[in-house]
């Protein structure tokens, strides 16, 4: 869900330390969710999620996976319905088959009834009651894990150690975060790690001698700005509503 990221998410400071005892609530809540019986569906499932609260590049990766697989399989993207995420839902619907319901399990049952062969879930790693065939955790290479604390003291939805239960990590963004890569590799040696960068596909259609208004309505505004600056865009004004 969309939110304005607190400044204290980035580094350990007085506010994050004061809120640290409240992370016990998140830890206990996560522990209870792990007790859920995992349900297996008659469809191959790929979950692309994150443990960092914020834009980590999930949706572009979901669309890319769908684009590759739909050449050979009947694919569908599943996204849990939130009223404040209609923009993302529209993007997914324009580029793929989409089932968007308030319950992921019901969405998967719907996909099975419609004879889809592969379901790609946009978010859902914290849905412990589903037995995914492949689970992928996304990170932004610059933000990494922020101050490293669980919510509400930090940006983590679950402990970094949960990566040992997942199949792959995608580190998305401009920064080559070697330090964070080393941390990930220590958690699970056989974890597949992929590094990606954002590349504009229509760069030639822009006049880089002109000034531009920076407008971001979804995703990670900081990463979007870094990408524009990398490709020499002159940003005159900024407007961020994501």
Q: Language-model segments: what does each one mean?
A:
Residues 64, 68, 122, 227:
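Rossmann-fold NAD(P)-dependent oxidoreductase module
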Residues 34-84:
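Walker A (P-loop) phosphate-binding motif
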Residues 2-5, 144-242:
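C-terminal accessory "lid"/substrate-recognition subdomains
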Residues 83-188:
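Phosphate/Mg2+-binding loops and adjacent switch elements
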Residues 76-78, 137, 212-215:
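Conserved beta-strand elements of the Class I
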Residues 58, 62, 85, 89, ...:
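Short, highly selective alpha-helical patches that border small-molecule cofactor pockets
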Residues 25, 59, 92, 122, ...:
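Residue-level signal for inorganic ion chemistry
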Residues 2-44:
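A transmembrane-helix-recognition feature enriched in membrane-embedded lipid enzymes
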